[in-house]
A protein has these predicted regions:
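Short helix-capping/linker segments at secondary-structure and domain boundaries
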Residues: 2-6, 26, 139-144
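Internal alpha/beta core interface subdomains
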Residues: 1-22
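Accessory "access/gating" subregions that flank catalytic or transport cores
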Residues: 16-140
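C-terminal catalytic subdomain
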Residues: 122-174
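Short alpha-helical "patches" and their helix-cap loops
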Residues: 9-12, 30-34, 144-155
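Short acidic-hydrophobic sequence patches enriched in Asp/Glu that either
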Residues: 7-10, 41, 170-174
Length: 174
């Protein structure tokens, strides 16, 4: 779970950089929007993005011509936040498990022998499934932001971030 937590921190940084590159609209990160849906991961992500973008000259506000950004930008708090919440749940379950007895049978302090099912892996299997889903969602939205970055039809940047295409293929295989 340590690597997953670090990945989520870096994902917020990548999300903020995407906002900068695309002159993202900052209103989707305003605190008022997130306090009315107080999911802890969502709140934390919105706060992180606000902090990372503080003082940026490369973001913008909504206008009549451009009311909102695509999901990959404006839903960063909801997507990253849900993954943060899932990973926090997994971390809690792992901490319980590594501090538990999973022997069978167990012998109490009083010498009483009890056969049971504490050896069963389901209490870890389900959280690890959640972990896989959480990381997959981060990968999915990250890939979509990369596509937006290298596709000149979706950004104001040259295709594959190459100024002079030809022999130089830039980020064609990202």
């Amino acid at each position: 779970t340590y690597d997953a937590i670090q990945l989520l921190k870096l994902s917020d940084v990548a999300g903020a950089l995407s906002m900068e590159v695309h002159n993202g609209i900052t209103s989707p990160f305003e605190e008022d929007l997130h306090t009315i849906r107080p999911q802890s991961g969502q709140l934390a992500t919105a706060r992180n993005i606000r902090n990372l973008l503080e003082g940026s000259g490369n973001t913008t506000v909504a206008t009549q011509q451009r009311v909102q950004d695509p999901y990959t930008l404006r839903c960063i708090p909801q997507i990253h936040g849900a993954s943060k919440d899932s990973i926090a749940y997994v971390k809690t379950k792992v901490e319980i498990e590594i501090n538990s007895v999973t022997d069978n049978p167990i012998i109490t302090k009083e010498g009483h022998v009890i056969s049971g099912g504490n050896f069963h892996g389901e209490p870890m299997a389900q959280p690890f499934d959640f972990l896989g889903i959480a990381i997959s969602e981060i990968g999915n939205v990250s890939e979509r932001r990369v596509e937006r970055l290298v596709n000149s039809q979706l950004s104001k940047l040259p295709s594959f971030l190459v100024k002079h295409p030809g022999l130089n293929s830039g980020f064609m295989i990202t």
